[in-house]
């Protein structure tokens, strides 16, 4: 009897990459990003493209320079696997507490994602950020 792979394991692992990416961005934790980004990962969004692991890790420093805090939330994901690759979309929001005033820049966004299974772990090879809408609103930062 041949045992069929359980796709729910891949789905959970792919979702975990998105969750760890979001947590890594908010905590400015490069180790979390290193765990979920492949060496040749490309992340692109409005007005920027980062290529390779080191350049992407450097963008965490830029987040810290641009914003006092961020809150990335993953609300859903659709993905399909094909052997050792996968593609899909990850949906969520990203809130950015501006550095120069008490306002939040909020995005409703999607990532068009591609992954590779390497050494038993799914890692992003490409993330394209698509902003569906954005808003700026007042914020009252915590103490």
What are these regions (language model features)?
Residues 97-102, 134-141:
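A short, polar/proline- and glycine-enriched secondary-structure boundary/capping micro-motif
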Residues 30-94:
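A solvent-exposed, acidic/Ser-Thr-rich amphipathic alpha-helical stretch
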Residues 94-98, 117:
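Beta-strand elements of well-folded, non-transmembrane domains
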Residues 1-27, 31-35, 39:
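Short, low-complexity N-terminal intrinsically disordered segments enriched in polar/charged residues
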Residues 87, 108-138:
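Short beta-strand edge/turn micro-motifs at domain boundaries
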Residues 63, 71, 97, 127-134:
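Extended, non-catalytic scaffold segments that flank or surround catalytic motifs
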